[in-house]
């Protein structure tokens, strides 16, 4: 706790634009709560802020003494929530092995369209990049395909609610537990069972909305169709099997969306 407080004081004076919250820190790792829209790694040679860059600034002393910044569980730019970061080579190797052995447990919260007919469901469906098998206007878009990598996700309904919007009125808060770690896994699996994530520009109501967003940015039309400017997915829990875990609540934007007109 003292180390976290010291970090906060240093960043208040040195880096006032710190864009994440420190949840826990030891000599081996730091756990942070990433806000939506913050990139994990640089994707272009620009000055856009990234979690990796800010962590390197935060851990400059450790890096100068032989440490490193190794992000263990990567999140998409729009996904918020917990990220585990190794500060040493030994810790990075250890966490990598835990990931391979599926001993690093991850749980997400997602807001989806509609009320599922089930309370708990396991989706076991292999995923592959769509462009390998058919035309795809979006290079990174994934699809369910038997030739792809195995992927399994467990879903549980946490809350059903009604909210009057321009695009629908029934929504659910879902807990998603991925048993594998494929690209866009939770989003594709939810879309495949007819309940895409609210705000999802690629797997939501129409993939052309993503292309429109790339061309024009956020518009009134996109807001009316998607309701949220980012997909409603949050990394809510991380746990090392048999050791310890971390939790973080829904961020303000998703918590406010879950304030229903009526809850079932």
Annotate the PLM regions.
Residues 1-15:
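Intrinsic disorder/low-complexity segments
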Residues 12-29, 35-40, 167-168, 189-264:
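Pseudouridine synthases involved in rRNA/tRNA modification
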Residues 47-50, 100-104:
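Glycine-rich, phosphate-binding/catalytic loops in enzymes
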